[in-house]
Amino acid sequence: MKKINIAIDGPAGAGKSTISKLLASQLGYIHIDTGAMYRAVGLKVLKNNISPHDRKKIVEILNSTDIQIKLVDGRQLVFLDGEDVTEKIRQPEVSMYASDVSKIREVRERLVKMQQELAKQKGVIMDGRDIGTHVLPNAELKIFLTATAEERAKRRFLELKQKGYDVDYYQLLDEIKKRDQNDMTREFAPLRVAEDAIVIDSTSLSIEEVLQKVLELFYKVVKNEV
């Protein structure tokens, strides 16, 4: 079966990574979570006590920052300056830093180059905010996965609670709304639906139902690509 690239975009907490991982497992594809790369930059900024709005210092620190994505047993690991930060970048305080640094053109340009290199061999499922519109505009299948802000906050709340974090639902809801605003209004590569993307609203759907919809679309595209 011919391999294609799949772009999955959408706002924070829409379930992009969950669906991408399941899809990659079923298809034998490689999953690349681009948000993890921005989180790694956000973590570095946070660790160095730099304001997420200090563009000059962030660009300076970026030049001495080494971010690597490694795939181990089908799982994506993120390394920041040689340290495995796969779990650390999921800390709640890193989220807003990631959103702020992602607005900086120089940060996006550097990470987009990395992302495009990773997708050259095909057979890649890449999720993020600007994959179908900017990173992989020629991806054979583009999905825009969304849900209400309230539903996304609820999912994130349950996920973080399960990991042992002490979080407040209303604070998470506020952060998600702010991230949506940041993502949609940033000057460079904002969050938007690609013209040829298929929109899936997962608000009232289970993970299995969303996965089934995406698989049906995948097989339809692959059939036409032969």
Swiss-Prot record:
The keyword Ribosomal protein does not apply. Keywords: ATP-binding, Cytoplasm, Kinase, Nucleotide-binding, Transferase. It catalyses: CMP + ATP = CDP + ADP; dCMP + ATP = dCDP + ADP. It is found in: Cytoplasm. InterPro entries: Cytidylate_kin, Cytidylate_kinase_dom, P-loop_NTPase. Belongs to the cytidylate kinase family. Type 1 subfamily. The gene is cmk. ATP binds at residues 10-18. This is Cytidylate kinase. One of its GO terms (molecular function) is ATP binding. Pfam families: Cytidylate_kin (PF02224). GO terms for cellular component: cytosol. It comes from Caldicellulosiruptor bescii (strain ATCC BAA-1888 / DSM 6725 / KCTC 15123 / Z-1320) (Anaerocellum thermophilum). Its main location: cytoplasm. PANTHER family: CYTIDYLATE KINASE, CYTIDYLATE KINASE/PANTOATE-BETA-ALANINE LIGASE. One of its GO terms (biological process) is nucleobase-containing small molecule interconversion. Its EC number is 2.7.4.25.
